């Protein structure tokens, strides 16, 4: 019995060792968020000058079905001011075909073309804020915990997204209030990830590579979002969005 316990402990140690080696060998990307005091017209387009001056995160890597670069290009840009985080995602799609099985907020219907922003504001690899949209502006938000094992879809705040569908791509422009996110005062950086579900190609891909044998939302494989101007104080004022039943009575 003692021998079996020792073997079990050794196996646990080796698994932890190999996992930590994998994480340490992982390359973590950096994306830079520029501070802007310009007004932003939320319309799903990046025609404001600052968007085109900001570097884009590219080269998304598949987490499913293969371990390779995504076949369709995705770009992400972030800017911020004193009150909001703005994110712009351009998802290329050579087929011009999209799967949109539901328009209901926080819908759990599978098979949806979508992009997801994830912010680990305390950089603890345990919790993150989740914001999802799709080509027609579906809104889904959630709290991710336990390193990515648990996703609480009951969390709802007020935020905005506008989208635009062009020839061979769609775009999502997000506006997320800072007073709805908890973060350390004066934050200079967060851990960050972007996920894309491309139903036409059958690919799930991420901005910062997540190995194919790991779950897509594993917080241990986030990259870094770096603010050129540190954020102010966290002034979290959570506003809950009530659900409205679609059943006619």
Residue ranges, per PLM feature:
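N-terminal secretory signal peptides that target proteins for export/translocation
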Residues: 1-7
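Bacterial N-terminal signal peptides
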Residues: 9-20
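Structural preference for beta-rich elements and adjacent junctions enriched in aromatics
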Residues: 25-249
């Amino acid at each position: 019995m003692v021998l079996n316990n020792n073997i079990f402990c050794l196996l646990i140690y080796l698994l932890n060792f190999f996992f930590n080696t994998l994480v340490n060998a992982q390359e973590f990307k950096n994306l830079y968020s520029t501070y802007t005091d310009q007004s932003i017209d939320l319309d799903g387009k990046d025609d404001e000058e600052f968007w085109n001056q900001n570097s884009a995160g590219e080269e998304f890597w598949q987490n499913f079905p293969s371990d390779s670069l995504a076949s369709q290009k995705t770009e992400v840009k972030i800017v911020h001011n004193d009150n909001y985080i703005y994110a712009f995602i351009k998802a290329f799609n050579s087929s011009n075909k999209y799967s949109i099985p539901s328009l209901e907020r926080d819908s759990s219907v599978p098979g949806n073309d979508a992009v997801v922003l994830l912010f680990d504001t305390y950089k603890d690899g345990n919790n993150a804020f989740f914001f999802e949209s799709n080509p027609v502006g579906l809104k889904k938000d959630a709290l991710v915990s336990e390193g990515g094992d648990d996703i609480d879809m009951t969390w709802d705040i007020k935020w905005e997204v506008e989208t635009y569908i062009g020839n061979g791509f769609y775009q999502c422009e997000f506006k997320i209030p800072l007073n709805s996110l908890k973060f350390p005062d004066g934050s200079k950086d967060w851990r960050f990830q972007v996920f894309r579900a491309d139903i036409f190609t059958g690919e799930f891909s991420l901005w910062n590579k997540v190995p194919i044998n790991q779950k897509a939302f594993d917080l241990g494989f986030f990259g870094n979002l770096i603010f050129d101007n540190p954020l102010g104080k966290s002034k979290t004022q959570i506003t809950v969005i009530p659900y409205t039943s679609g059943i006619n009575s």
